[in-house]
Amino acid sequence: MAGWQPASVVSVRDETARAKTFRLALPQPTGHRAGQHYVVRLTAPDGYTAQRSYSVASAPDGTNELELTVERLDDGEVSSFLHDVVVVGDDLDVRGPIGGWFVWDGDTPALLIAGGSGVVPVMAMLRLARRLGRSELLRVVVSVRAPEDLYYADELPGPETTILYTRRAPEGFARAVGRLAAADIGKRPDSGATVYVCGSNGFADAATDVVQSLGVTTDQIRVERFGPTG
């Protein structure tokens, strides 16, 4: 993991009404793995600093650029600043990549289960699989409240992906609204597969219970819990 380094904002795009993706250019190749995160630090003129961790949404590609998707929290020091103040051309201090547990390197079968903003590191894994032409290694299940809450709506859908809605679904959507169930996963993952679960504490616990009900063993499961990151 490198120390603090400057990162230039090269693009900003909306994912939802409350989430933006920031594409950053670093001085050197990122060297990150799918599933890792970076810390963003803000420094005020009086020297006060605030820092938060954000998962990388982009797949490793050998370049010096990466994408962070940030949900805006109304009382969040860093997320509010990123959403309301930061524009293309600004510089941010970042540190990373960080994390070696919740990572996927694109060469083993995996079941990816994400709730809400927990889809961010899962998207990095899915993008990596598609870039390598290895989508058959993945099964992806993403749970959101409603269509307007879905990150990467134009890119996420695909033959390896199941999207479910817990409160309101698009008109004509085949699955009834409701929480993740064993039927959404289908057959039990192979014994050699790793299950990645990412979301809030409640979602992570519920999803873990679901996959274990299918016979998945504890040592196959890797969990990343997402709390409010302001």
Regions found by a protein language model. Give the residues of each.
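FNR/FR-type flavoprotein reductase catalytic core
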Residues: 71-230
